[in-house]
UniProtKB/Swiss-Prot annotation:
Cellular component GO terms, alphabetical: Golgi apparatus; membrane
Reactions the enzyme catalyzes: Preferential release of a C-terminal arginine or lysine residue
Alphabetic keyword roster: Apoptosis, Carboxypeptidase, Glycoprotein, Golgi apparatus, Hydrolase, Membrane, Protease, Signal, Transmembrane, Transmembrane helix
Protein name per the record: Pheromone-processing carboxypeptidase KEX1
Annotated transmembrane regions: 509-529
GO molecular function, one term: serine-type carboxypeptidase activity
GO biological processes: proteolysis
Parts of the chain on the Cytoplasmic side: 530-597
Length: 597
């Protein structure tokens, strides 16, 4: 999501009402890119770009860039790519891993050897209006996601009408689209469920003349369920950034965030403090670099500069000859920004709203969904994604939760491409060697993800030997575990399942013997008291003079036994007491400074 926490402080250059609009084109041929600055003229890429007016006026226009598939374009599916933010241009996805193009500098286009257009038609969209090259007159930004979903649906139907090769005649005069897929990252974890839900509802409306065949969606490092994803301490602890005590401290303070979300406050300082506390704690002294929460393998002077290639995108798209070539905004006062501060501010109140219910509904309706996470991204990390998926309840839940986990490889790589769990119509991947932006970090792996998904191929290269036990979300809260005993002899060592079973048996046996010992101790004590009483009475009867006898009552003896039991089996023996230590906090929240890519 590059900017989910970092909406660059200097996002300036808002559009004015004086902007000159490029004449609206109604045919695909009008949007054909003839000569793209910086591209080798010998490059064989068929591409279109332009803007489509919403609501049949020039007030709001949405920009797109389309690439025809290199192979069998008349049958290949249409794959839509959406960046996040909210308010970040999809030109980031275009130039940083997905399209046929990369930028060598701010003027020269290179070739992406792992372009998705090799097997799919690609469509990159700048949305909501006011994002990237998309236009809104008078900075009339959308204030709710329902309106944004309506805008996107209108854009998509008009795009299909303009590029009518994607439509075929169906029954009762309804036009059916070719297979359509939506992929995106970061805040697209909100866009894609919202847009998919709207498309499905419109498909069921008999008044609509176009039915969009949404065949599947993919969400990379997505921001889906903030109630879980605002909490970063478990992921940070796994990296060695925090101690158990610091995790306990952060989880205690996280209750304020949950209270804010429950109260309907979806953009709360208390929710941003969790990440700030971690990054502030691990940062070295004054002048030191900061942890890049989009890729924890890096420490950067300015996290807002991530990814490093983004500055070339802004410079390239701001060249007038480029704007003319892509049929964009030709007003000399217009400035193309990677992320729109205005769009972000208008929608910031939705930052803590969950789309998990829509994900669940879409799965229940049979929509194929794939979630994938770069393992080194902390902002939208794999721990949070795996946990939120355990909160889903649909007709494929059992199949997904009980599914084996697989290691999958990509041709040309000896190391794993990632790890997969797939059941029902849901697939979840953890991608090795990648941070927040998987297509940028491992473009060959990202291309393989899309290729397998659109061709309905599984990620089942090698099943993992560790047995899968069905879990639910509450199981993820367990803080302590037992270490199984493993024989040093490989011939007599236990399997993972056997080790777990043996360890569990040892625990149960130990508890049983503990109870036996307690019962024996109580019985022995009672017998001893009785014997003592009998002896004293016999002795008293045998003496001529009266003697004073001090006795310990049964109640006192039992209380003493219980006190001894408590001393023998303290809380430290039953559970682990973790001292809570404070985590230093910094006031500046990454999320308040940037959104995402």
């Amino acid at each position: 999501m590059v900017t989910r926490h970092v909406l660059a402080a200097a996002l300036a250059g808002s559009m004015t009402s004086a902007q000159r609009l490029h004449p609206t084109s109604q045919r695909a041929s009008d949007d054909l890119i003839q000569n793209l600055p910086g591209l080798d003229p010998a490059a064989k890429v068929t591409q279109h770009a332009g803007r489509i007016a919403l609501h049949d006026n020039d007030k709001n226009k949405m920009f797109y860039w389309h690439f025809q598939a290199a192979q069998d374009p008349e049958k290949a599916p249409l794959v839509i790519w959406l960046n996040g933010g909210p308010g970040c241009t999809s030109m980031q996805g275009l130039f940083l891993g997905n399209s046929p193009f990369t930028l060598k500098d701010d003027s020269t286009i290179g070739k992406n050897e792992h372009s998705w257009h090799e097997f799919a038609n690609l469509l990159f969209v700048d949305q909501p209006i006011g994002t990237g090259m998309s236009y809104t007159k008078g900075n009339d930004y959308r204030l709710d996601e329902e309106t944004i979903a309506q805008d996107f649906y209108e854009f998509l139907t008009k795009f299909l009408q303009r590029h009518n090769k994607y439509l075929s005649d169906g029954d009762d005069g309804v036009s059916n689209s070719r297979a359509v897929y939506m992929f995106g990252e970061s805040h697209a974890g909100r866009w894609i469920p919202e847009f998919s839900d709207h498309i499905m509802k419109q498909n069921n409306d008999p008044k609509n003349q176009i039915k969009i065949n949404l065949d599947g969606v993919g969400i990379g490092n997505g921001w889906v369920h903030p109630r879980i994803q605002y909490e970063y301490s478990d992921y940070a602890h796994g990296l060695g950034l925090l101690t158990f005590g610091q995790v306990r401290s952060l989880k205690a303070s996280y209750a304020e965030c949950l209270a804010a979300l429950d109260a309907g406050t979806y953009y709360s300082r208390s929710c941003l403090d969790n990440m700030d506390s971690i990054t502030g704690s691990v940062k070295p002294g004054n002048g030191g670099n900061s942890l890049n929460f989009y890729d924890v393998r890096q420490y950067l002077r300015n996290v807002g500069s991530y990814p490093s290639g983004q500055s070339n995108i802004a410079k390239y798209m701001n060249k007038m000859e480029v704007r003319k070539a892509v049929h964009g905004n030709e007003d000399k006062n217009f400035r193309f920004d990677l992320c729109s501060n205005g769009v972000f501010r208008a929608l910031s109140k939705f930052d803590g709203v969950s789309t998990l219910d829509k994900v669940e509904s879409l799965l229940q309706q049979g929509l194929r969904m794939i979630f994938y996470n770069g393992q080194w991204d902390m902002m939208c990390n794999h721990y949070g994604t795996e946990k939120l998926l355990l909160n889903l309840n649909w007709n494929g839940s059992d199949a997904y939760q009980q599914a084996d986990k697989y290691t999958w490889r990509v041709q040309g790589r000896k190391e794993p491409a990632g790890f997969a769990q797939q059941g029902g119509n849901l697939t979840y991947l953890v991608v090795t060697g990648a941070g927040h932006m998987v297509p940028m970090d491992v473009p060959d792996v990202a291309a393989d993800i899309l290729r397998r998904f659109v061709n309905r191929l599984e990620f089942n290269d090698k099943v993992q030997t560790v047995v899968t036990t069905r879990l639910n979300a509450t199981d993820m809260e367990v803080s302590f575990c037992y270490s199984p005993s493993v024989s040093a002899d490989p011939d007599t060592s236990l399997s993972t399942r056997d080790q777990t079973g043996a360890n569990s048996s040892q625990v149960h046996i130990g508890i049983a013997w503990l109870w036996v010992a307690l019962v024996i101790a109580v019985v022995s004590s009672v017998l001893a008291v009785c014997v003592t009483i009998v002896c004293i009475r016999n002795k008293r009867n045998g003496k001529q003079e009266h003697e004073m006898i001090t006795q310990v009552s049964d109640d006192e003896e039992v209380n003493q036994i219980e006190d001894e039991s408590e001393e023998g089996f303290s809380d430290e023996d039953v559970g682990v007491h973790v001292l809570v230590s404070n985590v230093s906090q910094r006031a500046t929240s990454p999320r308040s400074r940037v959104t995402e890519v």
